Amino acid sequence: MIKKRVIPCLDVKDGRVVKGIQFQSLRDIGNPVDLALYYNEAGADELVFLDISKTEAGHDLMIEVIEATAKQLFIPLTVGGGIQNLDDITQLLNHGADKISLNSSALKHPELIRQASEKFGRQCICIAIDSFYDKDREDYFCTTHGGKKLTDVSVYDWVQEVEHLGAGELLITSMHHDGMKQGFDIEHLAKIKQLVNIPIIASGGGGNAQHFVELFQQTDVSAGLAASILHDQETTVAEIKDKMREGGILVR
């Protein structure tokens, strides 16, 4: 049985870690390098850096932050946000990223997934999906540009397409759960898992350690992402893992 992962997520804007609720009302959390090293020591299985400054305003890729972090990190580092082409991916991997997360650029140019997978290996390519539930259409649709632009692309169709194109992993953020701390979107995640064979990282809604237990007991996703509850020290990676063990879930 595969051990489940707990992954802190650091949203970085203009060189600082920020966090909001449902992608809005961002507040400053701290220095990304310091926080990354803290989570490395605290037992995190991986780290995700999402450069939302790049997504919003076209800021340069945060190479210096990634390089400084990777030099001292002993766990895998995934980097996403504003990655447009193979050159961007090459630069990030060369400066310390272990995996790359593609979102808007993959929706705009799906062939980028295949090209990146063939060049770097599918294990390096994670497709991030900011999933929005449209009440009128009663279905989930992909968004782009940091959740600001709604598309007509069905999440359930897109996850199957990206797996076919060569994605090695999915990062699914349920936007209406993001920052709400009321639990993961279990039904949505379970349905996605039925459609694909690649690992899924669940994001959006983890408000306490028990929510991670419920996530792994009720779905077959591979990992749970956490941000505000860790940044605000409402719980720790160790406490989440202890609760998971109590629930009979294998952890690293």
Curated annotation (Swiss-Prot):
GO MF, one example: lyase activity
Catalytic reactions of this protein: 5-[(5-phospho-1-deoxy-D-ribulos-1-ylimino)methylamino]-1-(5-phospho-beta-D-ribosyl)imidazole-4-carboxamide + L-glutamine = D-erythro-1-(imidazol-4-yl)glycerol 3-phosphate + 5-amino-1-(5-phospho-beta-D-ribosyl)imidazole-4-carboxamide + L-glutamate + H(+)
Cellular compartments annotated: Cytoplasm
Active-site positions on this chain: D11, D130
Top EC class, one word: lyase
InterPro entries tied to this protein: Aldolase_TIM (IPR013785), His_biosynth (IPR006062), HisF (IPR004651), IGPS_HisA/HisF (IPR050064), RibuloseP-bd_barrel (IPR011060)
Pathway(s) the chain acts in: Amino-acid biosynthesis; L-histidine biosynthesis; L-histidine from 5-phospho-alpha-D-ribose 1-diphosphate: step 5/9
EC number: 4.3.2.10
Gene Ontology BP term (one): L-histidine biosynthetic process
Annotated GO CC locations: cytoplasm
Record keywords: Amino-acid biosynthesis, Cytoplasm, Histidine biosynthesis, Lyase
SUPFAM superfamilies: Ribulose-phoshate binding barrel (SSF51366)
Function of the molecule: IGPS catalyzes the conversion of PRFAR and glutamine to IGP, AICAR and glutamate. The HisF subunit catalyzes the cyclization activity that produces IGP and AICAR from PRFAR using the ammonia provided by the HisH subunit.
Oligomeric form and interacting partners: Heterodimer of HisH and HisF.
PANTHER family for this protein: IMIDAZOLE GLYCEROL PHOSPHATE SYNTHASE HISHF (PTHR21235:SF2), IMIDAZOLE GLYCEROL PHOSPHATE SYNTHASE SUBUNIT HISF/H IGP SYNTHASE SUBUNIT HISF/H (PTHR21235)
Family, similarity comment: Belongs to the HisA/HisF family.
Name of the protein this chain belongs to: Imidazole glycerol phosphate synthase subunit HisF
Gene name for this UniProt entry: hisF
